[in-house]
A protein has these predicted regions:
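Enzymes that bind and transform nitrogen-containing heteroaromatic metabolites
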Residues: 1-154
Length: 154
């Protein structure tokens, strides 16, 4: 089972200079609750951003895979050079956690989308390429002020 998890605003904005364009504790708590201790896949920029955020603390994931076209020896992660081959052949639960290129490369292979819809419009420079969410089935939805947590099944 492959999951992808991200937050986006009304314009499908997901980032600003390699960080989130917002700081909403409920969204951060949801992301942590969903991914903590899990096997994750992310791009190199996302990895470096998280390492900067957590500083000396270990990242809160089980197994960590980092997509990079270059061969890199990460101290706490395995390098993945061919993301598409990796997700097509990976047999266990996997959480795709960013960034944009990794989401878009893996989207055809993802079984469940966990999207936090951040109500409103924010400033940033990284937008998710639009796709038809209606091709997915909404299987779970929770609303709180300013956010909609939605899970979609392929």
């Amino acid at each position: 089972m492959i999951h992808a998890i991200w937050a986006m605003d009304a314009n499908w904005l997901i980032g600003k200079d390699n960080i989130l364009p917002w700081h909403i504790k409920e969204d951060l708590a949801y992301f942590k609750a969903m991914t903590e201790g899990k096997t994750v896949l992310m791009g190199d920029a996302t990895y470096r951003s998280l390492k900067s955020y957590y500083k000396e603390k270990p990242l809160p994931y089980g197994k960590i895979y980092v997509a990079n076209l270059n061969v890199v020896d990460y101290p706490d992660a395995s390098c993945v050079n061919d993301v598409i081959h990796f997700v097509k052949t990976y047999k266990e639960e996997l959480w795709v956690i960013g960034g944009k290129a990794i989401y878009e490369l893996t989207l055809p292979y993802v079984n469940l989308l966990h999207i936090t819809h951040v109500l409103g419009v924010y400033e940033g420079n990284v937008y998710f390429s639009r796709f038809n969410l209606n091709t997915y089935q909404l299987v779970e939805k929770k609303m709180i002020p300013g956010l909609i947590f939605a899970t979609y099944k392929k």
